[in-house]
Design a protein with these regions (language model features):
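C-terminal effector/interaction modules appended to NTPase cores
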Residues: 4-130
Length: 130
């Protein structure tokens, strides 16, 4: 069986591009700072780097990456302060404000809440110029 080097190079380039896009999210500054509060519905702790869905608008769930301050994980009933970096903040501009409580979800199941204490990305700030 002969393998086309051109086809293999194209596949490799596509995979590298996908990895680059995923790593760009990890290398961006966080979008918001929050207080995480988990409600006990998870069986296991949420580890730093956890990527659940967040209900940022009444009709919009988006994935975000959690980073926790001073702890590696938060127990199922625990709280901690940290940040969320959203995957596509340009899709839901001007929808957040300090004090807003957004649900943290695994599918339709709410596993906790994040109360916004700071907004770093002006595009997301409801009162910002974005």
């Amino acid at each position: 069986m002969e393998i086309s080097l051109g086809h293999l190079t194209k596949q490799l380039a596509e995979r590298l591009n996908l990895c680059h896009k995923e790593n760009n999210v990890m290398n961006r500054f966080p979008d918001i700072e929050v207080i995480f509060e988990f409600n006990g519905t998870r069986k296991n702790p949420a580890n730093d780097g956890y990527r659940p869905a967040h209900l940022v608008m009444d009709d919009y769930l988006t994935t975000g990456i959690h980073h926790y301050y001073g702890v590696e994980s938060i127990p199922p009933n625990g709280t901690a302060k940290g940040t969320i970096t959203f995957l596509s903040p340009e899709s839901y501009p001007h929808c957040l404000w300090i004090g807003k409580k957004i649900s943290i979800q695994e599918g339709a199941r709410i596993v906790g809440y994040a109360t916004i204490t700071n907004i770093y990305n002006p595009l997301l700030n409801k009162t910002g110029d974005g």
